[in-house]
Amino acid sequence: MSRCSALTQKAAFARQNVKMAEKISKKSTSVMKRSRVVAKAAVSVPTTLKAGVVTGQDFIDVMNHARHHGYAIPAVNCTMSSVTNACLEAAKEANAPMIIQFSHGGGLNFAGKGLSNDDQKAAVAGCVAEALRVRELAKLYGVPVILHTDHCAKNLLGWFDGLLEANEKYFKENGEPLFTSHMLDLSEEPIEENLEICQKYLKRMKAINCFLEMEIGITGGEEDGVDNSDVAPEDLYSKPEEIHDVYKALQPIAPDFYSIAAAFGNVHGVYAPGNVKLTPTILGNAQKYIIEKEGITGQEKPVYFVFHGGSGSSRAEIREAI
């Protein structure tokens, strides 16, 4: 390659980087604005809750504070450090907790596209590297921060295993896991297999005080390469009996140390008003069903629910789901 052509390529690459930086800046600003809108609806965090990355009982305390005061904790998929910083800044400004989460693709982005992802090493390393950076910064922002990883389908269990190994190593050295929680999304598998795999991993996670999120039913739309946009409408709604099956399978292993991403018509992506038919009464009916079947007293909401595909939802819709 001639020096002239090499310089031309470098100049083009530099221009591309400038354009990318401009896009990143705009995206970060947009994320910060959206995060502020959601977070400002929350009750201010009391000083009794730990600031910085929270795990174990500290995380449960944050969840219970949200449950008792009737607000949701926003979760933002971060694919670059500038987006992560925007979330931290928004949480600080609103004095509210924030869930910072990484997808499999986000992990690869943090690691750099030049790395091979043999045995999921790059996806794991990218998530771990950004998690360590968040841990160093989060305590300075003065609010509880939840470190989480998003959808992990059956074909990505190697990624999940690598993340748990990193958690176990961190726990051995620091007495807590690196991440607060992780999500298993086996919603496309038979429910029996979904629950069996979740049980196996929850036993391992409970040993290091790491929280599990699981999915039952299918969230429509497309995210991180998983396309459910053609799913039949009836499959976008979980049944109370199915949610109760999850409760029966996981509650004996780690009481209240898991959450359920149930389907109530929610979809990934932003759609025109009227195109998404949310039925949050499914969540309320499931809570009542579990209370009745289990004979629970003194608790109106025994299950932690997750609202997937919340982008584009109105404040009224989020409030109704809560």
Question: Model segments located where?
Answer:
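N-terminal chloroplast transit peptides
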Residues: 1-28
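Acidic, proline-/serine-/threonine-rich low-complexity intrinsically disordered repeat tracts
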Residues: 29-42
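N-terminal amphipathic alpha-helix/helix-capping segment at the start of soluble metabolic enzymes
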Residues: 40-74, 297
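Metal-cofactor-binding active-site regions of metalloenzymes
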Residues: 45-51, 70, 74, 86, ...
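Short, conserved beta-strand segments within well-ordered enzyme catalytic domains
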Residues: 75-77, 99-101, 146-148
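Glycine-rich beta-to-alpha transition loops that act as phosphate-gripper elements at the mouths
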Residues: 78, 147-153, 303-313
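Active-site/pore-lining binding-face segments in mid-to-C-terminal subdomains
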Residues: 310-313, 318-322
